[in-house]
């Protein structure tokens, strides 16, 4: 009897593991860790110290995963009503709310200890503040309270480059804040494009996203304006001497592409274009930070 029991229980173990992993939003965390790594590299003119590098990436990743799991927990009711999220572990009942809370608390606590002990207290507390900003202030309150939810709450999501910088230097620097500004301005057009595509679902669950409260055309205008502001912000690393020609060329090309996509969305919209803008924004941020990294090592 033992052997059949072992075989039949194996799929549930695999499913549980995958469900917990899904709650950490691994794709989002991976992009975030890229910006953390770039922040680390730009902070150091030489080779990165091994301990802050490994402990910093691991601790920040764990606390980011904890914040994502708390997001799943808090949003479980509305997730069950939206086509994009109804199959998540909590709405489907594959993981209970209690277990999700324990998982998030354990993951976040361990990440905090790793950062505090093996990196530095400054990075640990800044990462904790980001977790609170995203999981509680944004998810639990702002998301349901104001159409400017993503603008205000976006500050928490813009912190990773600063976290990477402080992880290896244990201090603030103006250059790190420039990277925060870039992600802060990138966040609204990124999420508003998705909100346009999913506006009916957001309206159904009473989430006051900008397309729901102010209309699609107003949101398209805001996306276009933010992409222009973002393009200006992307030039700041060059203007302050932080980055060189390679980054300037790459960032200019990416900014032109993003503005063009936003202009198309405003004046030549067609079915599926909002999601194209959303996807382009992801590649924009990823390639922009890769350009920062390459430029740093090629032109330093």
Swiss-Prot record:
- Report further notes: Carbon 2 of the heme B porphyrin ring is defined according to the Fischer nomenclature.
Keyword Cytoplasm present in the record's keywords: the answer is no
Its annotated function is as follows:
Converts heme B (protoheme IX) to heme O by substitution of the vinyl group on carbon 2 of heme B porphyrin ring with a hydroxyethyl farnesyl side group.
Family the UniProt entry places it in: Belongs to the UbiA prenyltransferase family. Protoheme IX farnesyltransferase subfamily.
- Which InterPro entries does UniProt cross-reference here? Protohaem_IX_farnesylTrfase, UbiA_prenyltransferase, UbiA_prenylTrfase_CS, UbiA_sf
MF GO annotations: protoheme IX farnesyltransferase activity
Q: Which reaction does it catalyse?
A: heme b + (2E,6E)-farnesyl diphosphate + H2O = Fe(II)-heme o + diphosphate
What is this entry's stated membrane topology?
Multi-pass membrane protein
Give EC number(s), comma-separated.
Answer: 2.5.1.141
State the top-level EC class: transferase
Where are the bilayer-spanning segments?
28-48, 50-70, 100-120, 122-142, 149-169, 176-196, 222-242, 243-263, 280-300
Q: In which pathway does it act?
A: Porphyrin-containing compound metabolism; heme O biosynthesis; heme O from protoheme: step 1/1
Q: What is this protein called?
A: Protoheme IX farnesyltransferase
